[in-house]
Each structure stands twice: as C-alpha cells, then as structure tokens.
Curated annotation (Swiss-Prot):
<dbReference type="InterPro" id="IPR006641">
    <property type="entry name" value="YqgF/RNaseH-like_dom"/>
</dbReference>
<keyword id="KW-0690">Ribosome biogenesis</keyword>
<comment type="function">
    <text>Could be a nuclease involved in processing of the 5'-end of pre-16S rRNA.</text>
</comment>
<dbReference type="Pfam" id="PF03652">
    <property type="entry name" value="RuvX"/>
</dbReference>
<dbReference type="GO" id="GO:0000967">
    <property type="term" value="P:rRNA 5'-end processing"/>
</dbReference>
<protein>
    <recommendedName>
        <fullName>Putative pre-16S rRNA nuclease</fullName>
        <ecNumber>3.1.-.-</ecNumber>
    </recommendedName>
</protein>
<dbReference type="InterPro" id="IPR037027">
    <property type="entry name" value="YqgF/RNaseH-like_dom_sf"/>
</dbReference>
<dbReference type="InterPro" id="IPR005227">
    <property type="entry name" value="YqgF"/>
</dbReference>
<dbReference type="GO" id="GO:0005829">
    <property type="term" value="C:cytosol"/>
</dbReference>
<comment type="similarity">
    <text>Belongs to the YqgF nuclease family.</text>
</comment>
<keyword id="KW-0963">Cytoplasm</keyword>
<keyword id="KW-0540">Nuclease</keyword>
<dbReference type="InterPro" id="IPR012337">
    <property type="entry name" value="RNaseH-like_sf"/>
</dbReference>
<keyword id="KW-0378">Hydrolase</keyword>
<dbReference type="GO" id="GO:0004518">
    <property type="term" value="F:nuclease activity"/>
</dbReference>
Length: 149
C-alpha cells in the first residue's frame, strides 16, 4: 500500500486468545478504531470461517494482530500462538499482517470499559473486542508518530 490508498486503508485487528478472539475495525484516514465482535475460539475451522465472514463483510486492506509479551518485553506462552494465528491469516487470506506489542491492551481495555460504566457480563463479553480496539488504536498512534518524525 502506498500513497492515498495507504492513508485511507481499512484494518481489522485481532486480540488472539485461547478461548476468545477480539476483533476491532479501523480506518487509517480517521485514525479511529472501534471494537467490533468477539469470536469464540472453538477450533481452527470455526475460527477461520468466522474470520473469513468478517473479511468478506468489511473488506480490510490489512490486518493487525496483537503480540502478547511479558512486561519486560520477553515472549510468553501466547506469543507463539498469536504469531502462528497471524501467519495463518496471511497465508489463508493473502492480506498483509502487522504485529503490535499488546503488553497492556487488556488492562487499558478494562479501564476504558470501567470508565464507560460497562459492568458485569457485558464487560466480560466486550473485553476482548475492546482489547483489539486498543491494539489497533496503538497501531494508528504509532503511524502518526512515524509521520511526524
């Protein structure tokens, strides 16, 4: 992607987890991201069928996958699984994948939902999609930082 197309690109972002995958949608032009949906991570077939449906509906130009790390930046158990998920997305759907350090995305997502008074089951249901939104917003913020230097 280059020029105007890169600036107006649509992105889907994923917060990969063993039980659930949070998904967010965003646009590079507006630099805004919103929580979209949570996919139950039941098995590979279900996971990629659900992702395929989202890709058909939203037609993103690129994908962003959160890469879980320990606070000191070292990989942990989920790092390799998230990396594999991103590689599979790229292989199956032919879209470019960018990884974003998601060290504090869940903490930030939880705080954001609390600020908006989202409670109980609704908060639990939305948390992974909100974490994906945080990941995508972080990606857009990093793009902005690079453009201003």
């Amino acid at each position: 992607m280059s020029g105007a197309s890169a600036r107006d690109a649509t992105f889907l972002a994923f917060d990969y987890g063993e039980k659930r995958i949070g998904v967010a949608l965003g646009n590079a032009l507006t630099r805004s991201a919103r929580a979209l949906v949570v996919i139950p991570n039941l098995n590979r077939e279900h996971r990629f069928k659900a992702v395929g449906e989202l890709l058909a509906e939203w037609r993103p130009d690129a994908l962003v996958v959160g890469l879980p790390m320990h606070p000191d930046g070292t990989p942990h158990d989920m790092t390799q699984q998230a990396k594999r998920f991103g590689n599979q997305l790229n292989g199956r759907f032919g879209l470019p994948v960018t990884w974003v350090d998601e060290r504090y995305s869940s903490v930030e997502a939880e705080a954001g939902l609390r600020e908006r008074n989202v409670r109980g089951r609704a908060r639990t249901d939305m948390l992974d999609a909100e974490a994906a939104r945080v990941i995508l917003q972080q990606y857009f913020d990093e793009l902005s930082d690079h453009e201003h230097h």
